[in-house]
Amino acid sequence: MISAGELNKRIILQIAQLKQDSYGEPIETWTDIATVWANIITSGGREFYAAQKMNAETTAVIKMRYRAAMHTRFRIKYGNRYFEILSIADPEEHHESLLLSCKEVV
């Protein structure tokens, strides 16, 4: 069972949708699905060199209440930060909580 105090961050679940710009060209936009309480644990980061520039990557585990419709196509918005969902785990298959392994999109 998850205690209410454990989930102390408000996050927004978003899904990508293709829409058309004013010229009729397809563009990807993100649409809010739900706002939920969660706990964000930043687990580390790394710097790497790619495409002739230095990049940084931060990983996190986000814990939230169970939602049957969760998918890795979604992303998490927390304030002005965005997280790509890499995997979703249902600890012990109890359908009480989900652990989302994520990386921050910079």
Language model regions located:
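Polar/acidic, low-complexity leader/linker segments enriched in S/T/G and N/D
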Residues: 1-2, 9-16
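Short, conserved turn/kink motifs that form compact alpha/beta structural patches or helix kinks used as
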Residues: 4-7, 20, 25-106
